[in-house]
Amino acid sequence: MKEVAVYQIPVLSPSGRRELAADLPAEINPHLLWEVVRWQLAKRRRGTASTKTRGEVAYSGRKIWPQKHTGRARHGDIGAPIFVGGGVVFGPKPRDYSYTLPKKVRKKGLAMAVADRAREGKLLLVEAFAGVNGKTKEFLAWAKEAGLDGSESVLLVTGNELVRRAARNLPWVVTLAPEGLNVYDIVRTERLVMDLDAWEVFQNRIGGEA
């Protein structure tokens, strides 16, 4: 990734707000983001859809009427695909939908997704979740101070289990551990909130791709 820009990212701390300079992609490639999201969803797909062929349906294989002299069309058994309840031709069978995507593309996609939130002013870094000890009401009080009122969906990334536990009951918050940060969850939510430890994990993951 050749084009890099310096983003000023707000950092929220108990003593107030400051800014952190970060090198992230200057240009966002929507198609690359789509490729990564498509790869993620394909990996999650169960692929259990299954239809029965004419050899698997629960019907006798007996010919339903003689070939000639009935005045009717020629048919074999009643399990043929032409009959209601018969087998399915070329229907889905259980399969694995996952495929490989180059690690470099995945790194670029993650860096671009975070950069897009930074460019929109929707990325917030947090030094400490003061007063949050596992209770939802504690997180709501902190969120109000941070300017998060539930009007926008939030992806909260932190290694602090107590903070994740406090926020997970809220319908407008998606919580992830730092290692679980991914493009799909970033693009499906409107704001990205990370603590500084999660930010460091992210920087190590993209490893120069910005």
From Swiss-Prot:
Coiled coil: none annotated. The keyword Glycoprotein does not apply. One of its GO terms (cellular component) is ribosome. Changing E56Q: Restores Ptase activity of hybrid ribosomes to that of pure E.coli ribosomes. Significantly increases binding of a tRNA analog to the P site. It comes from the Bacteria. The keyword Ribosomal protein applies. GO terms for biological process: translation. GO terms for molecular function: rRNA binding; structural constituent of ribosome. The N-terminus is blocked. One of the primary rRNA binding proteins, this protein initially binds near the 5'-end of the 23S rRNA. It is important during the early stages of 50S assembly. It makes multiple contacts with different domains of the 23S rRNA in the assembled 50S subunit and ribosome. Forms part of the polypeptide exit tunnel. Part of the 50S ribosomal subunit. Belongs to the universal ribosomal protein uL4 family. This is Large ribosomal subunit protein uL4. It comes from Thermus thermophilus (strain ATCC 27634 / DSM 579 / HB8). The lineage of its organism: Bacteria, Thermotogati, Deinococcota, Deinococci, Thermales. The gene is rplD.
